[in-house]
């Protein structure tokens, strides 16, 4: 949706017309993905959180963009639809002063279609988690919190991720919680190796909390000592293989 706002053409007298036509065009592409077998689609930046903080959540422009977004994803009820929201990431820089979801939480939870809402949280010190308290027992969407930052190059530890998850569980039930990064690592600055360590920490951190909740853990190859290639001299790899988690 953010890209649609930047379209400039003399073919349309009203920016809303081009946005709506682009939403319909995108809908055809998304339905084609669905028909090809795709069962999980993420939509990047509907911009509701930016616009709600600028104009107010009930502004006519915001209402129109919600309608356009819902038109874009129409007919995808059999696909898990992710709605990605962060606060910008040019060269891994913070660019927004007001990064509160307070004006947009109702939009994302109640007014727009989708199954999973992703939020930038780690880099904002989990600000706004308390906003989910009134919805805790009736969340219609899964909530994907960022548990590692896409702007910090220091690799996170599994214990760090587990700590972020515990904070989120105070306001979001485990069956509705998804753990992710704040945003993608594919922009400028973060190399593949650091991104790998951060992603691995997410998986291992989830397992720490799963054990605490009595839930089944998942196998994480990155934590399997048997697969380790940079073995420290004198370390007994076989004795540590059991910690693969």
Predicted regions and their residues:
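Domain-level signal for soluble alpha/beta catalytic cores
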Residues: 1-245
